[in-house]
């Protein structure tokens, strides 16, 4: 159970672009957790576990394989086969990217966020994949190409399931600062394309068979029953992204998992993160 999260010192802190020789560009979140069972065993004494989440820039020498694994988790086993994950990991490592680690900069990231410039990479395998997903994306990309003064970022982000959502606001703020530095003159992207996933809470599969139905034909015995009464989010921030999305659509559920695609403008992205941060403060 998360008891305390120290984020105040992160809100206005900017990560340095170049690490100092004897330092790093890391920011820390100190999370204290308790185990209620241990509390009872220790007569009410809390056992406190402190975890420091350190924020780093993408490191091609260390992060490549871990990013591929996180991308495979993001897209799922089926969609991952349609994407050149190695090429996409290279794009991420060549773009404004923030990773979160717990064992120093040489360790594997538990989380990442990246903003890949669309126009600079519009011929990439990943863009070609997105164009085939839905006509709305293909049309939007054409509009961006034809527009001389508008641009968008391909937002890619994933984290291990036990990463707390409290890391998300500083993660976005730090990376958006890096985007402004990369674009120059404190600029930002006009639009952001976010790919994420949701899941069916009550997804279930049952064989329509029992001992009294064994004489029915094989087709009837092999039928599956799917219940999808409720859909929920893997990532808490996606609730807010959907709220402010200019375009939002989803794929059909596959084994209880739904791919979700959103296009937000800059104002919508910032509002989403601000509202998420406000929501977290009430927990």
UniProtKB/Swiss-Prot annotation:
The modification Phosphothreonine is found at residues 205, 209. It is found in: Cytoplasm; Nucleus. Pfam families: BCCIP (PF13862). Phosphorylated by the PHO85-PCL1 kinase complex. GO terms for cellular component: cytoplasm; nucleus. Present with 4590 molecules/cell in log phase SD medium. Involved in nuclear export of the lipid kinase MSS4 and of the 60S ribosomal subunit. May also play a role in directing MSS4 to the plasma membrane. Plays a role in actin cytoskeleton organization and vesicular transport. This is Protein BCP1. It comes from Saccharomyces cerevisiae (strain ATCC 204508 / S288c).
